[in-house]
Amino acid sequence: MNASAVTIRRARPSDADAIAGLASQLGYSAEPSAAADRLSRVLARSDQEFLVADHEERPVGWIHMLVSEYVEAEAFVVIGGLVVDREYRNQGIGRRLL
């Protein structure tokens, strides 16, 4: 499998379980119901973006981005989180998400 076989799309509320599962690979213990609540809030905000990498309609990675600004600087993006499933790492998926 290569990164071109992956589709990048905006996260949907129905992705919450998969997102929580992938977050657990980073050491976070996200309850699916809590993840669903937080994801819904993130998706409703215009200053945040949450993208999912799908392979064969299965989420295999995600990135959470937030827009931030300082008085002394233009707006910039902060990466709140980025994960690719262990089985899919080192194939360019993280690069595609970025």
Q: What is the predicted function of each stretch?
A:
Residues A30-F50:
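Active-site rim helix/loop that mediates acceptor-substrate recognition in acyltransferases
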Residues Y88, G92-L97:
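Conserved acetyl-CoA pyrophosphate-binding loop and the N-cap/start of the following alpha-helix
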Residues A20-S33:
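Helix-loop element at the rim of GNAT/NAT acetyltransferase active sites that forms part
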